[in-house]
């Protein structure tokens, strides 16, 4: 079978969160069947010479390409001086040679959950999930996103893991008090081939075990960011099924031949503990 030539795209994945500087990863997409190794990533995928600038309230900062523990690939363009604040707009400008890409995002006001708890099926259940209760603001149209981290006896998430559902709006419960089950979505299967069965069982689990400390990040998004992350809900649910077609994921980056997202997060973090002697319905300790 002769496959058509693949046209590579510029990929811009950027974020800024209340209390943190901006982080942007700039790369090129690759053919599905192209060989991928460390040398290819460093020399052909990551773009290390872009000029990445973030602006807010008339102040601009050029981000520096550096090692970054918060980046999935340990490398990113990172800011220092402009720190995310609720209610402010942040403009992104990326220059690659003579080509310019731009985007804007807003950090909303942070939102606090009413409560979050470990949800047990019955008194004998030892692998709970998490449930949340929230009261929606009837005066605004809100867009919610959740992420999770586990620090356990064996599993220690370095990055925030996307939940399922990834993101949703308040169209069906505006102004109401509701509760949802929030599951730890399976991370990428990229590393599965290098894991033992025991490691896979630990890494890809959606429930919690005794000794876990669970961090839940609740974020409010602006509308453009919500469109991107809500589309990712579908991709996470069926994207690794070879019999399903991938869905188009919206892009809020302006420019030619580009995909990606520049997203502002208004976030709060709650902490749950599941000690070895835990009983059903142990409640949140809020920080």
Tell where the protein language model's regions lie, with residue ranges.
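A sequence/structural signal for flexible, mid-protein segments enriched
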Residues: 1-287
């Amino acid at each position: 079978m002769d496959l058509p030539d693949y046209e590579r795209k510029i990929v811009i994945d950027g974020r800024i969160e209340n209390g943190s500087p901006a982080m942007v990863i700039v790369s090129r997409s690759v053919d599905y069947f192209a060989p991928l190794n460390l040398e290819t990533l460093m020399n052909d995928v990551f773009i290390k010479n872009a000029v990445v600038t973030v602006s807010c309230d008339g102040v601009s900062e050029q981000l520096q390409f550096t090692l970054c523990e918060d980046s999935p690939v340990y490398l990113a363009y990172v800011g220092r001086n402009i720190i995310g604040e609720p209610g402010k707009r942040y403009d992104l400008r990326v220059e690659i040679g003579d080509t310019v890409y731009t985007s804007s995002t807003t950090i909303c006001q942070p939102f606090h959950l009413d409560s979050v708890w470990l949800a047990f099926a019955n008194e004998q259940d030892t692998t709970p999930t998490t449930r949340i209760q929230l009261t929606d603001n009837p005066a605004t149209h809100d867009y919610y996103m959740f992420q999770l981290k586990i620090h356990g006896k064996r599993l220690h998430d370095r990055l925030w893991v996307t939940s399922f559902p990834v993101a949703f709006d308040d169209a069906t419960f505006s102004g109401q008090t509701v509760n949802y089950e929030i599951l730890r979505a399976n991370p990428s299967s990229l590393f599965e081939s290098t894991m033992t069965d025991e490691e896979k069982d630990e890494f890809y689990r959606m429930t919690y075990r005794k000794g876990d400390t669970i961090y839940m990040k609740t974020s409010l998004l602006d509308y453009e960011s919500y469109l991107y992350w809500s589309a990712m809900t579908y991709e996470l649910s069926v994207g690794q099924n070879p019999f399903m077609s991938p869905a188009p994921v919206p892009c809020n980056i302006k420019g030619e031949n580009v995909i990606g997202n520049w997203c502002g997060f208004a976030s709060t973090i709650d902490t749950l503990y599941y000690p070895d002697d835990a009983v059903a319905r142990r409640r949140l300790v809020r920080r």
